[in-house]
Amino acid sequence: MINVIDSMCGSGKSTKMFKMMQESYGKNPNKRFLYVTPFLSEIDERVPKELPSMNFKTPENKGSGKLSSLCDLVTKGDNIATTHVLFSVLTSEIVDQIIKMQYVLVIDEAIGCVGLLNNELKKSDTTALLKSNMVFVDEE
């Protein structure tokens, strides 16, 4: 299921997402999260401050690079915070591993990420997703 939260800038969307993650994790600490944001400050400052019990890890630019580090974190089942840039270059193998490990994907400021699918999704695909309730728009 995809839950889209759309609202004015500064209306508390990120805060709402953080609260939803914290509540979900509180109910099931085995749940895994992949949080994607365009802002390094969110990863470096806000995530550790607001979600300390979830122990989010960040891909590091060591050894084989950030993409390899992300793959390692997914394989270990860590909660992960990363950027849109790194998310945009995921390989199909990493995506398969994310699915296999049953990650909850949370994309903040998702316009750029969703744009990656524009060449693959047709209007009829979007309509079918909405009608099947696999995607919905949160009116809050």
Task: Go through each PLM region and give its residues.
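Conserved catalytic network of the ASCE P-loop NTPase/AAA+ motor domain
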Residues: 26-28, 71-74, 96-99
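Signature of the SF2 helicase/ATPase Hel1-core->accessory helical subdomain module
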Residues: 87-140
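Pre-Walker A adenine-sensing motif
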Residues: 1
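Loop/turn-to-beta-strand initiation segments
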Residues: 32, 76-80, 101-104
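Inter-Walker segment of RecA-like/P-loop motor cores
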Residues: 51-90
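Hydrophobic anchor at the beta1->P-loop junction of P-loop NTPases
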Residues: 5
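Conserved Walker A/P-loop ATP-binding site and its immediately adjacent core
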Residues: 9, 15-60, 85-87
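Helicase motor interdomain insertion/brace
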Residues: 8, 13, 76, 138-140
